[in-house]
Amino acid sequence: MTFQFNFTIEDHLEDELTSLGDGALALHSSKESLVSERQKGTHRDKKCSTEQSDLLQDHLWEHKSERNEAPSQDPDSSFGAANSSSNLEPHEEKPCLKVAKEHAVPKDLKKVLENKVTETLPGLQHVNISIMKTTLLKENFPGENIISKSFSSHSDLISGVYEGGLKIWECTFDLLAYLTKAKVKFAGKKVLDLGCGSGLLGIMALKGGAKEIHFQDYNSVVIDEVTLPNVVANSTLEDEENDVNEPDVKRLRRSTVAQELCKCRFFSGEWSEFCKLVLSSEKLFEKYDLILTSETIYNPDYYVPLHQTFLRLLDKNGQVLLASKVHYFGVGGGTHLFQKFVEERNVFETRTLEIIDEGLKRCLIEMTFKYPT
């Protein structure tokens, strides 16, 4: 399989300062020129600051309440601050986090699959994403506009805008194969498909008898146009295969499909915002027994919120199954860097389950708490 990444990398500003004195003067002048822009964006900046402050407070609370055995230092915050400051220009504001939201399952399930063409994998169906993209472009889809941006930039990833959910990446197939081969048990478990994209990992958990499955992706259009249709297509697959004509049987099957979909919830948004959303529920949040995630460690900038998500949402006896390439060229992430990051925080232990040495080298990793009690 030929696999290629296309990335959008912003040009850095050239350093036009010719001396220390001139540099200080230029910096001062630049600051003054930004005053009016900052005044115009006061409300936005305050909102960003509040969100960032809330995230830090949430982290400190989790650190104190759940990491009693781990070192008292807060490594995630220091890593995030250093990483953030090194990537921002002198006057560049840190962008606001993408607010998370829950997507309701439509009552009319036929509309979910309207204008969708499905393809078949062993035991699974999924929407043909290329046809879906073309259809939405022709219809001038009013959503996040990530499809046209992806086409125009010739990129499968646009950091902070589009995080690759409109593609089934190689490692997803690796993890699907492992789940089957290792006979991973889903029955009675609460499962999260994190960075779900097509949602095939969560769908496999649904078919395996999981009691509850949550699907999360960065982009809302991915949830609405890919994940939800895939879940519906796989829930109704049995009906289509048997071509049942008896009204009573059809009603029974529709009832079964509805019951299956009641086990599923769908979310979009940035990871730390997703954590806030599910943890702010009125009823006590039951943590996940199993988190499935594929191709989510390509960018080291995202390691802090990803680690925090595992820390906050995984049950103390839970398990993360993660699929990734060993190295992502052009972005810098990969399994070795992420495992080093995890080891330095001393919260989780990692174990390599499988190495796939075909094309770009890939790995399957298991994560569990070092201190489950």
From Swiss-Prot:
Residues 70-88 have a biased composition (Polar residues). Keywords: Cytoplasm, Methylation, Methyltransferase, Nucleus, Phosphoprotein, S-adenosyl-L-methionine, Transferase. Residues 30-42 have a biased composition (Basic and acidic residues). S-adenosyl-L-methionine binds at residues 168-172, 195, 216-218, 269-271, 294. One of its GO terms (cellular component) is nucleus. The keyword Repeat does not apply. Monomethylated at His-154 through automethylation. Automethylation at His-154 positively regulates the methyltransferase activity toward RPL3. Probably methylated on other residues. Belongs to the methyltransferase superfamily. METTL18 family. Protein-L-histidine N-tele-methyltransferase that specifically monomethylates RPL3, thereby regulating translation elongation. Histidine methylation of RPL3 regulates translation elongation by slowing ribosome traversal on tyrosine codons: slower elongation provides enough time for proper folding of synthesized proteins and prevents cellular aggregation of tyrosine-rich proteins. PANTHER family: HEPATOCELLULAR CARCINOMA-ASSOCIATED ANTIGEN, HISTIDINE PROTEIN METHYLTRANSFERASE 1 HOMOLOG. This is Histidine protein methyltransferase 1 homolog. It comes from Bos taurus (Bovine). The gene is METTL18.
